[in-house]
Amino acid sequence: MKKLVATAPRVAALVEYEERAILANEVKIRVRFGAPKHGTEVVDFRAASPFIDEDFNGEWQMFSPRPANAPRGIEFGKFQLGNMVVGDIIECGSDVNDYAVGDSVCGYGPLSETVIINAVNNYKLRKMPQGSSWKNAVCYDPAQFAMSGVRDANVRVGDFVVVVGLGAIGQIAIQLAKRAGASVVIGVDPIAHRCDIARRHGADFCLNPIGADVGKEIKTLTGKQGADVIIETSGYADALQSALRGLAYGGTISYVAFAKPFAEGFNLGREAHFNNAKIVFSRACSEPNPDYPRWSRKRIEETCWELLMNGYLNCEDLIDPVVTFANSPEGYMQYVDQHPEQSIKMGVTF
């Protein structure tokens, strides 16, 4: 049996593993499809994550250095790549009552030929409805962050909405914003293929930020008013600067991205100072979230799963390219790390 592992920073390989016996609360799944996470996972893959040498302390709500003798947060050679898997249950533990051998399921897990997942009181292990799309299923994770970004920005009927960065999260945010009643939805991304997909799924306009004054173009498209809401998923300083420039007075920026360090030159004066901008940092898995207790992570997940399985969201075009598991190391290094412009969310077939 093989699994996809980061053996060194920016190096992926298939590594042999021995299957272990499942515990009473677990199921073993033979994986048929999967997908990695193109955002935070690739930061880890590049050894650029703060979690390597630091840990986020829940009591202090801040990062703190790991003790010198403590394991690092990411250990290359052990770091398994992948985020979501779809497959069939081939073994059930004795305490498992909600699943059976043969069930087709989707869950969080790494890209490996088999995965073992807790199946007792685990709502995150989802049964696949008959005839449902695996491509929609592996978008379960990005859909949650897209939906929280839209909700935290309080998108309302008639709003002018901009989505910056048209990866999987941004593409799903486009669909959600349009279906929430936004009158104008604008996508921002330099990659023409991503813009084409966004237009097919709800974007009224798409802007290429390279060599353009995106903020002014947003104002032009909205009759000089600017955007009521800008959902920022790219994590780049220039994107946030443009968002502050294109935002309507009193508008909201929903900051979904796990940002890169900002270089010198980012300016919170200028339009940010004059336009009463509000920036909300949106993260679906940080609880309690802004609408707690009515909305919890569980409710977000259950809503996203329903929207993915009933076809309200369409992620077929987002899973591109699709590679075989045998070619997944090369695919991961090319499409996820080295040339992310060639993909939106890479799919893997087994």
Each predicted region: which residue ranges?
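Glycine-rich beta-strand-centered segment in the early N-terminal region that forms part
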Residues: R20-A35, A47-Y108
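A structural motif shared across PLP-dependent enzymes of the aminotransferase-like
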Residues: Q80, Y108-N121
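Residue-level marker of beta-strand positions
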Residues: D103-S104, T114, F160, R179, ...
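Short, glycine/polar-rich helix-capping loops at beta-to-alpha or helix-loop-helix junctions
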Residues: E113, P190-I197, A263-L268
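Mid-domain Rossmann-like dinucleotide-binding core that forms the NAD(H)/NADP(H) cofactor-binding site
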Residues: S133-A212, K216
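Glycine-rich cofactor phosphate-binding loops and adjacent beta1-alpha1 units
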Residues: V155, R200-V280
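C-terminal capping/lid region of NAD(P)-dependent oxidoreductase domains
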Residues: K224, S254, K260-P261, G265, ...
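Active-site capping/gating segments
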Residues: K278-E302
